[in-house]
């Protein structure tokens, strides 16, 4: 079970809303979100309702302003609790439709470019666990939640291009 608290103002001030499960529309509970406290679980937050727009991955911890979760603005309109698994495995491909296997990963990868001499991933297959793909190295830039399934092209995970900088397993560290 997870627990996350959204605050309208920075520094955990202002009106707040506590959530313990997926919520496709947070708009009735607050008008803006400038700080967040994650008490338990791993969460993916979305800029727009119904799990649309920019995505932000948060683990247990305090986020006193939206820049702490690499937010582009103070808009959080939906969230989902990500189930934690003990094993993680995914395959990266350099071409669409899972052609041109690059590698199979079971650990975090802070820099795809350094490890595989590649800055784009055109398709992938998540075999086990949930992952977050970041468009830039060292877990920066736009984020995309990857659940176990086949992603035949980068648009399938919500990206506008094939840019891939780093990958992180979804693991609740506490």
Swiss-Prot record:
Gene Ontology terms, MF aspect: structural constituent of eye lens
A Gene Ontology cellular-component term: cytoplasm
UniProtKB keywords: Eye lens protein, Methylation, Repeat
Residue segments, region Connecting peptide: 84-87
Alphabetical list of SMART domains matching this protein: XTALbg
InterPro entries reported in the protein's UniProt record: Beta/Gamma-Crystallin, Beta/gamma_crystallin, G_crystallin-like
Keyword Repeat attached: yes
Coiled-coil regions listed: none
Superkingdom in the source lineage: Eukaryota
Residues the record lists as S-methylcysteine modifications: 23
Entries under Gene3D superfamilies matching the protein: Crystallins
Residue span(s) of domain Beta/gamma crystallin 'Greek key': 2-40, 41-83, 88-128, 129-171
A single GO BP: lens development in camera-type eye
Domain notes: Has a two-domain beta-structure, folded into four very similar Greek key motifs.
Family: Belongs to the beta/gamma-crystallin family.
Function: Crystallins are the dominant structural components of the vertebrate eye lens.
UniProt name for this protein: Gamma-crystallin C
Protein species of origin: Bos taurus (Bovine)
């Amino acid at each position: 079970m997870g627990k996350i608290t959204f605050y309208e103002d920075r520094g955990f001030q202002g009106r707040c809303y506590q959530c313990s499960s997926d919520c496709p529309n947070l708009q009735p509970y607050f008008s803006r979100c400038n700080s967040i406290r994650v008490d338990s679980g791993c969460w993916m937050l979305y800029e727009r309702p119904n799990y649309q727009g920019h995505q932000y991955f948060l683990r247990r911890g305090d986020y006193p302003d939206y820049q702490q979760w690499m937010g582009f603005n103070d808009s959080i309109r939906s969230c989902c609790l990500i189930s934690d698994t003990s094993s993680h495995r995914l395959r990266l491909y350099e071409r669409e439709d899972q052609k041109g296997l690059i590698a199979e990963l079971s650990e975090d990868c802070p820099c795809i470019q350094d490890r595989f001499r590649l800055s784009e991933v055109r398709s992938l297959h998540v075999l086990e666990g949930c992952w977050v793909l970041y468009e830039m190295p060292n877990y920066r830039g736009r984020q995309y939640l990857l659940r176990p399934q086949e992603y035949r092209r980068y648009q399938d995970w919500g990206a506008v291009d094939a840019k891939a900088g780093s990958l992180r397993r979804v693991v609740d560290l506490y």
